[in-house]
């Protein structure tokens, strides 16, 4: 969904700490993540872009929990937390009660190993713009999963121009969270 937890749009930066373990395991600083609408979010178009972001940091769950910048993303600080796996002394994690994910999601969430931080992100919402087919970046077979593509500098510049030209969601119905387009 685009409920605000995956990714989490709250300041100081957009973060992806839950769901999408494959992306979180592989992404590196400088990578672009494009998120397409799922069937529940937008049943009419599987190629609409809900959000996009450029990875600026890759943190472990322990680093994320201990980083003061992200205290505001813990369960007692927001309605849509994503910072709810507290490190334990045996190198594991203790799930913290939250309204987003139950304890049954812990293996999937922490299996992604990393938390991605995006200082530069675009939020388009559930009915975001359709990614032009000629970019060659659409999900081909289904709406689930992930795929990687290497872009040349001209391809990336063209995509960035397109992303910057799209209207952003600035206020969501779940509160006054604003997009973090910088």
Segments from the language model and where they lie:
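Structured loops at beta-to-helix junctions and adjacent beta-edge loops in soluble globular domains
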Residues: 1, 36, 56, 121, ...
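Short N-terminal edge-element motif at the start of the domain
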Residues: 1-45
């Amino acid at each position: 969904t685009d409920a605000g937890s995956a990714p989490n749009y709250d300041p100081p930066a957009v973060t992806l700490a839950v769901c999408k373990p494959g992306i979180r395991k592989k992404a590196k600083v400088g990578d672009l993540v494009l998120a397409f609408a799922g069937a529940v979010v937008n049943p009419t178009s599987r190629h609409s872009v809900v959000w996009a972001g450029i990875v600026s940091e890759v943190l472990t769950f322990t680093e994320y929990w201990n980083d003061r910048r992200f205290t505001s993303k813990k369960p007692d600080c927001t309605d849509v937390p994503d910072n709810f796996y507290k490190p334990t002394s045996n190198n594991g994690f203790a799930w913290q009660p939250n309204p987003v994910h139950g304890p049954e999601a812990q293996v999937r969430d922490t299996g992604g190993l990393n938390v991605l931080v995006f200082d530069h992100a675009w939020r388009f919402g559930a009915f975001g713009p359709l990614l032009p087919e000629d970019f060659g970046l659409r999900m081909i077979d289904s709406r689930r999963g992930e795929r990687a593509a290497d872009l040349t500098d001209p391809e990336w510049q063209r995509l960035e121009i397109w992303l910057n030209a799209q209207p952003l969601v600035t206020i969501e119905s779940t509160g006054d969270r604003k997009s973090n387009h910088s």
